[in-house]
Amino acid sequence: MRLISALLLSLICVQLSVAQNIQQLLYEGAPVIHGAQVTGNYPNTDFLFTVPATGERPIQFAAENLPEGLNLDGTTGIIKGVVKKSGTYPVKITAINAKGKTVQMLLIEIGDNLALTPPMGWNSWNVFTKYIDEKMLIEMADAMVSSGMRDLGYQYLNIDDYWHDVARDSATGKPVVDPKKFPNGMRYVADYVHSKGLKLGIYSDAGTMTCGKCFGGYTYEEIDAKTYSEWGIDLLKYDFCHVPLKKSEALSRYKKMGDALKGSGRSIVYSVCNWGFFGPWKWVPELGGNYWRTTPDIFDLWKGAGIWQMSVMNILKRSHGLEKYAGSGQWNDPDMLLVGNYGKGHATSANGRFKGLTDTEYFSHMAIWAMMASPLLSSCDLRSMNEATKAILMNETLLRINQDKLGKQASRVSKKDNVWTYKKDLHHGGVALAFLNTSNSTKQVNIDWKNYTDMSNFKIISATEGQLTVTENRTVNLAPHQTLVFELSATK
């Protein structure tokens, strides 16, 4: 996919619009299987996984050694069913088209753990806030497929606040959706999303009300979890508004919902959103959470703002040192991606005060989030992405680094001359490196690869240039706020 890398380089460096279409580039040539090489699910619950693959269509998919209870649709690459027996199941996936064939192993873990790699998908909050409805969500699901995002591993479509009716069902206490926004109900949306090989997420709050003052989940945890299961929900983001700001309250309330989700009869990924208070990285995994917010909300800013309006650099500074808490099924969450909003997001622009990042800064934002093994949740309008946004969100090298099954979060290993260097170990014994220029002036960096790897023979893939010729060192010029990312892996 060197063409895409070259296109991205032109987009982020010279900031020109181009006529080439990312989707066309993704669907040329022999099949390539992307995304996670491992996925988890609870036993006796619905399983859904789409083999993420690009290449010329049609592609015919096949699977060897699927666990009993699962079936693969050979045309769509969607695997679904129910597995009763816990265990580790290595599955051989084959994809064939007119241009060639590829084989990839997929490890299916049926047991107690979900989100074995960082969740990838989309969330409604940054761009839409309360302006959500059934029609828009269905269009967003279609856009995730038609853009090529699903075929690169994006799978969650997450509804944030404001899906609620004015009150719960007075007789049963069950949550009720706003009938004007969702005339066919939430199950209808879930069924549609699932038919596309995607998963549906929803939002609630550990308090009596959500941050938007809709009804919260406090004291209704079991009712809500079972209702979400009936609706076909696959992920819950659980906020912390209208709650006494005490650690004991956080632990108690998040545990109740964690227990309720575990007993819901469905594999529901649990996102804890208490903005980093009380060090959630230390206790969320014990309560059943899969990822946790490390800071207050992100805004469309490179740097500056205050404690409740975090910029990319604010969040990045707070992330250093948290890497030891990240791993398979438990991830630090530095909040959603800003990429593609350009100051137009209803939430992230702060009502138009913040004008957004440059494409160079959006790429750096995406690159460092990928290196940090963060959940990658886009929150722009997928229906109207420009080519730069598509190229950034669908950068195959960054996504591969993020989804690496070793599950390591990058560490900052240098901050010399305002160039921050990050290193992330990868499952094949290689490393990913990122060089971020945090200053407002161009920096020249001399990279000696031997400082970062013990491998004697290796290849180098640049996230913006494709495969490079290996030399002992490489000198690069980094523009202000620019990031370059390299993946090093052993050669035979």
PLM region descriptions:
Residues F363, W369-M372, L377-S379, K415-D454:
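Carbohydrate-binding surface patches
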Residues Y220-I223, V269-C380:
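Glycan-recognition surfaces
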Residues P31-E56:
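Solvent-exposed, low-complexity, repeat-rich "mucin-like" stalks and linkers
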Residues N126, E139-M140, M144-K247:
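Aromatic-lined carbohydrate-binding/catalytic grooves of carbohydrate-active enzymes
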Residues G69-K85:
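Strand-loop-strand motifs at the edges of beta-sheets in extracellular beta-sandwich domains
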Residues Q20-P31:
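Proline/serine/threonine-rich low-complexity linkers at boundaries of modular beta-sandwich domains
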Residues V470-K492:
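C-terminal beta-strand-rich structural cap/linker in extracellular carbohydrate-active enzymes
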